[in-house]
From Swiss-Prot:
Gene3D superfamilies: Aldolase class I. Its EC number is 4.1.1.23. The lineage of its organism: Bacteria, Pseudomonadati, Pseudomonadota, Betaproteobacteria, Burkholderiales. GO terms for biological process: 'de novo' pyrimidine nucleobase biosynthetic process; 'de novo' UMP biosynthetic process. This is Orotidine 5'-phosphate decarboxylase. PANTHER family: OROTIDINE 5'-PHOSPHATE DECARBOXYLASE. It comes from Ralstonia pickettii (strain 12J). GO terms for molecular function: orotidine-5'-phosphate decarboxylase activity. Belongs to the OMP decarboxylase family. Type 2 subfamily.
């Protein structure tokens, strides 16, 4: 099944636009897992089991695994999600961007080694740096557009031909880059006016929206700005607020409570 089909099915089946980010910080893992073999996998698996029926996607951040030499645990985690919850797509948050020959190997890493359903990429080096990902025709390619960090404005708001760079990225994604029909854009919840502008430009293209929860993005403003006519179109990501709702042995139950509340709050404003 193609990424966009998986995503649409998950929106409907779980009645959810919530994406849970899997960013396992060893310094914040529960004491019961500290020092145990495979602690990162065990933590993430418990979060996945507690929230899988509440989400439209999971988004592991590769750096949190690679910095701990835990790439094998990332492989194990994605394999587990696919086996236990085959209807939930996995987005590898890698934000790769390099020349075509190198990008071919990053694409193999994402889609062949890790078996992710989608990957985040940077458009800074242009279309040829994204083509190797798009060659995997069933896989999602989610392009950084208007990011949630404050420093994103340094480049994304520079003007070219009378409009900011982030709008040009959205236009190129709509008109030129989306050769597989599986492209999406990253637009931060911290900037709802820009979400609305991107939605206007790209139509029904899926948007990955980080920045709610710990980053303080407003859920109502985000949903109203980014929803499509049928009340979908978004993967609204929350990571830390869910993962670290508790650092005690009840961490998975606490994560479920926060995920459920977040999903239900999102759903208040979908229609």
């Amino acid at each position: 099944m193609r990424f966009t089909e998986q995503l649409a099915a998950a929106w409907q089946r779980n009645n959810s636009l919530l994406c849970v980010g899997l960013d396992p910080d060893p310094a914040r893992l529960p004491a019961s897992l500290t020092g145990t073999g495979g602690a990162i996998f065990s933590f993430c698996r418990a979060i996945v089991d507690a929230t899988a029926d509440l989400v439209c996607a999971f988004k592991p951040q590769i750096a949190y695994f690679a910095s701990q030499r835990a790439e094998d645990q990332l492989e194990q985690l994605i394999s587990y999600i696919h086996e236990a919850y085959p209807g939930v797509p996995v987005i590898l948050d890698a934000k790769r961007g390099d020349i075509g020959s190198t990008a071919e190997h990053y694409a193999k890493e994402a889609f062949e080694r890790y078996q992710a359903d989608a990957v985040t990429v940077s458009p800074y080096m242009g279309f040829d740096s994204m083509q190797p990902y798009l060659a995997h025709a069933d896989k999602g390619v989610i392009v950084l557009c208007r990011t949630s960090n404050a420093g994103g404005s340094d480049v994304q708001f520079l003007e070219t031909d009378g409009r900011p760079v982030y709008q040009v990225v959205a236009e190129r994604a709509r008109d030129v880059w989306n050769t597989s029909g599986q492209m999406g854009l990253v637009v931060g919840a911290t900037f709802p006016e820009e979400i609305a502008k991107v939605r206007e430009i790209v139509g029904d293209m899926p948007l990955l929206i980080p920045g709610v929860g710990a980053q303080g993005g407003d859920i109502e403003a985000t949903v109203r700005a980014g929803r499509t006519a049928d009340g979908t179109g978004m993967m609204i990501n929350s990571s830390r607020a869910i993962l670290y709702a508790s650092t005690d042995s009840d961490f998975a139950d606490a994560a479920r409570r926060v995920a459920l509340a977040t999903r239900d709050q999102i759903n208040q404003f979908r229609n």
